[in-house]
Amino acid sequence: MSNTPIELKGSSFTLSVVHLHDANPEVIRQALEDKIAQAPAFLRHAPVVVNIASIEEEVEWRAINEAIAATGLRIMGVSGCKIPRLKTEIDRAGIPLLTEGKEKASRPAPSEPTPPPPVASQITKTRLIDQPVRSGQRIYAPHCDLIVTNHVSAGAELIADGNIHVYGMMRGRALAGAGGDRDAQIFCTHLAAELVSIAGEYWLSDNIPAEFYGKAARLRLGESALAIQPLN
């Protein structure tokens, strides 16, 4: 047992991000309820981050907050806020204002070219799972790809910030690009997933085209939706 009453440790959690493109609270509520109805087991009472980068007009945060809360979603934070008054309103509501990892503070250009890092530092590790992934298990591969060389049961969940490869029957949920990488892909030799997701865009099993169900397939993210093709 630790001698200290508390301990702070770094960790990573996968959260869905709700990108708002309309400031009307009723429109937001209805759109969210429609999404939740498509995947209630995945989204009902889910913790989410709300991105309001597309909202440039003056809005009342309280009304938007109440509309989202009415759907059962739980707001863990708000990102992309560019309006000072709105930032103050969100902060007073006790909701954290988040800065997305891809945002970087501007800095002057270096006077000389920066030498490339050593080759070893450019290598991205891959998490490899050889055992079957059983129902109820959740496997997360932060900042790398995930490869499973066995079957994935229904009720199991694979999450990776990079690509996901499954060399076996894929019956569970696969969430690639969990950190927002829209170039991530999913590769399966036998696709029968409950849910597939890339950077927050997802399909339920009913959305998977029948001609690909149970077959070898490759999924990627198009301009605004998932796309699928045979895995050769």
UniProtKB/Swiss-Prot annotation:
It comes from the Bacteria. Residues 99-124 are annotated as: Disordered. One of its GO terms (biological process) is cell morphogenesis. InterPro entries: CAP/MinC_C, MinC, MinC_C_sf, MinC_N, Septum_form_inhib_MinC_C. Keywords: Cell cycle, Cell division, Septation. Residues 110-119 have a biased composition (Pro residues). Interacts with MinD and FtsZ. Belongs to the MinC family. Cell division inhibitor that blocks the formation of polar Z ring septums. Rapidly oscillates between the poles of the cell to destabilize FtsZ filaments that have formed before they mature into polar Z rings. Prevents FtsZ polymerization. This is Probable septum site-determining protein MinC. It comes from Klebsiella pneumoniae subsp. pneumoniae (strain ATCC 700721 / MGH 78578).
